[in-house]
Regions:
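Aromatic-Pro/Gly-enriched surface loop or interdomain linker
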Residues: 89-93, 98-157
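Hydrophobic transmembrane signal anchors and adjacent membrane-proximal interface regions, especially
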Residues: 72-73, 125-127, 132, 142-146, ...
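Beta-propeller domains
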Residues: 129-202, 208-209
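N-terminal carbohydrate-binding/catalytic regions of secreted carbohydrate-active enzymes
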Residues: 1
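PLD/PLD-like phosphodiesterase catalytic module centered on the HKD motif
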Residues: 4-89, 96-103, 107, 112-118, ...
Length: 359
């Protein structure tokens, strides 16, 4: 609501142009999107400054672009929906670029998407078939692509990313809202979880409604196999003094990012609004970022580790009355033992944390 209030203030001053999704129930007369559209037109002298559309799926980007004297100078992108859930409940990321070049690119894509006619011709345009690469000294290495793509370009992008995941040398970390869609990228991620060649740690939102269609991969002593945990559908009985876990309306994990080799020679994170699903990448309005910068990658790595550690604990279906981290009378079962056993994932995790980044 607070963001909507500010947007409507800008609309009243004729300082806002907006593309708002109208897929499915987003265009219902009783929808919040419809209410916002009507309020926009009530306060603005330029009712055409709001355009509804969905390409051929969803208008799925989450972007703000700032302009001064008709020149873009700042842009916000990422996975965050500008809603109460998106800001206060979901796990999300947002990235702000102050590069004029990056901001202008997003502004040009916005103009090329503004209105249903432009959306219908976007797929196949230069914006949808080009990887926009920024390698200036003032920026980290960045590649940005804009969907919906023609099938050949979606395949090219997905092949490049899945090959990088399959070739991970030190680690793979991820937080993906839904990792079971048809996608060579998501297949590569799932395959890494099942192997022990690199440290793999990840979280998705929902495994299945009854946890039978797909399985979580929890910590297994004396094994280096990866972890994949779920954030929703958990039915834990928490140990005292904790009570019942509050239900969440919507997603807990809304991220869509994959980190490859955060301690390797060429760390990279793939992030943005794309769900990394092959079909939607050919239908939805989306943006996918590839960032080669150790500091940025480390920030995403910490987020993945934070989420997995918490929800792994939640996934264990705790039933005991007390939770003992350590038994001082029996150090053979001390909680930290596994962190020093060669061949154990915990030991691999400790070594990853303390190791120097490769150069």
């Amino acid at each position: 609501p607070e963001i909507c209030k500010r947007l409507l203030k800008l609309a009243k001053e004729n300082r806002l142009k907006i593309i708002l999704d109208n897929a499915g129930d987003h265009d219902d007369p009783s929808s919040w999107e419809k209410a916002f559209e009507q309020e926009f037109k009530n306060v603005s002298d330029e009712p055409e400054f709001i355009q509804r559309g969905n390409f051929s799926g969803l208008n799925h980007s989450k972007v703000f672009i700032l302009l001064k004297n008709n020149k873009a100078f700042k842009v916000l992108s990422g996975s965050t929906n500008f809603s109460t859930n998106g800001l206060y409940i979901n796990s999300n990321h947002a990235i702000i670029f102050t590069s004029n070049g990056v901001a202008q690119l997003y502004s040009d894509v916005f103009d090329a998407s503004f209105g249903e006619e432009n959306m219908s011709s976007f797929k196949g345009s230069d914006f949808s078939t080009t990887d926009f690469i920024f390698d200036q000294a003032s920026l980290p290495g960045i590649s940005i692509s804009f969907a919906p793509h023609p099938k050949a370009d979606a395949e090219r992008i997905f092949d490049r990313i899945s090959n990088r995941i399959n070739g991970a040398e030190t680690d793979l970390l991820f937080a993906i809202m839904k990792d079971t869609s048809t996608s060579s990228i998501l297949d590569a991620v799932q395959n890494k979880v099942k192997t022990s060649d690199v440290f793999t740690y990840g979280i998705t939102d929902v495994i299945s409604k009854n946890n039978t269609d797909y399985t979580v991969f929890l910590y297994k002593p004396n094994s280096k196999r990866g972890l994949r945990v779920a954030a929703r559908g958990i039915t834990n009985v928490l140990p005292k003094p904790f009570g019942k876990v509050a239900a969440i309306d919507g997603y807990a994990i809304h991220h869509k990012f994959v980190v490859v080799d955060f301690k390797g020679k060429n760390p990279v994170v793939y992030c943005g609004s794309s769900n990394l699903a092959f079909g939607p990448e050919q239908k939805n309005g989306d943006n996918l970022l590839e960032i080669h910068d150790r500091d940025v990658v480390t920030a995403f790595a910490i987020e993945a580790l934070r989420l997995v550690d918490h929800f792994h604990w939640r996934n264990r279906e705790l039933t005991q009355d007390e939770l003992n981290l350590d038994d001082l009378n029996n150090p053979a079962t001390a909680w930290y033992n596994a962190w020093f056993i060669p061949g154990d994932l915990r030991s691999l995790q400790r070594e990853l944390y303390i190791s120097a980044a490769q150069s």
